[in-house]
């Protein structure tokens, strides 16, 4: 008999486990005294097909912590009891150890505990020592995904493949998504967040043929709901503040929470940061959307599905899934056709990497110099600035950097745009549903991301006279209305009611300092309004209809990484309009705009009525 007596105190057990003469057998001896219990601790079942966080009961920590003591390196200083307990709880939470119970806890042999540590070290890319050494403990403290790494006992067996599958997939190929709430802490604007999340979904769409469509959750229940939350947020994975668990997502299924993806709002979410102060949102989003599609964690060194945060992964426009993740995804949803002429049902928001060699430009359509300005259209599309000129366009990332100094081809990017369309005169992203509208002549085309939807439609739908075309179009977030400018006049369109507003056109001179017949107008990610004409731009602060005193300024140095002019350019300013009484006009416009404003801002309207007027 290895353990005399019928009851053993924790102190006595520590003494017995530590003694070298205690027993030559294993700890699985049936002679180990058992304490009477009503039954093992039961975790309430969940109908959601997602991994569960298995928390180690308090009574199981001392025993398993003591069992791990012999696994510590002999020459290293043993960590204290709190660190060992943390390690055991960590291994249990992330699936490497089963939950302890008072009846079967003694079945945990040292060999099985060593195996669990080795699997953890394999996932982390550490030497598989089977010991809770300092590097292992340090890795356990790294920021990571909330979900377990091992899905059942089979996950402990070394596989030829590194990826793991949850066993659940979406039964449809078009998935809808929506953002329930944005981060309250991050300096990233909602528009940039939406763009990064769209790109993260597009990464998976490229390799699977799946289609992701953003919808308004007020009108349609999305498959994937994205939520920035803190601490407990009504699921089984409460967040732990900055630096611990970063995010989690639920596997596909029929439950309302299936596919939902949550980010810890106490993290400092960044994008394109060159320092270590923050967590790259795009990298984490790609990882979590892998879970939302049915992938588990992977131990492959380069996999985006490794459980630990690995830092930024690069430009969303060029990022592609590593091979291990592609293999796992295609096990679930099949392979994308390898025929280069075959088109998947949905293209990503960004094109795949361009071929290394491109045909020379035709003399009829030479590549223009971006620093010359005179753009045909400028638009903010999901946080990126598109600048159109002839059959070309440039793109600026949300960080303000050029995607490439070389422009992209118009028809190569916008699939389905008629070949006879050589110039885009105006463009904007419709805020109601994210559709992208391109204008040329008296017509416009509607795109779902890059794919054309339907035939050309006439501009008369926006309230313009038949045969009229536009100089500029933009949606103003101050009141949610869409503005269409032609020459010295502008029209206004109500997107919600889907009709032109009465009382238009009006004089563009109401926008004090704006140039007549601008090349285009767009809204920045910070909410400022920018008029573009020729080689210069005019800035209007958020919510203002008066140009800033430093306007106009050259476009090139500010937007396109062009050298600053040697001297201040001589710009012919638009004719200044004399100040005139606008009390009635202001009153009418404010009454209309107030329907779109937050109730918290309504008491401030009398204070600013002298500055905000009808336009």
UniProtKB/Swiss-Prot annotation:
It is found in: Cell membrane. Coiled coil: none annotated. One of its GO terms (biological process) is hard palate development. Gene3D superfamilies: Collagenase (Catalytic Domain), Hemopexin-like domain. The active site is at 288. A motif (Cysteine switch) lies at residues 143-150. It is an enzyme of class 3 (hydrolase). Residues 336-366, 547-582 are annotated as: Disordered. The precursor is cleaved by a furin endopeptidase. The keyword Disulfide bond applies. Its cofactor is Zn(2+); Ca(2+). Belongs to the peptidase M10A family. This is Matrix metalloproteinase-25. It comes from Mus musculus.
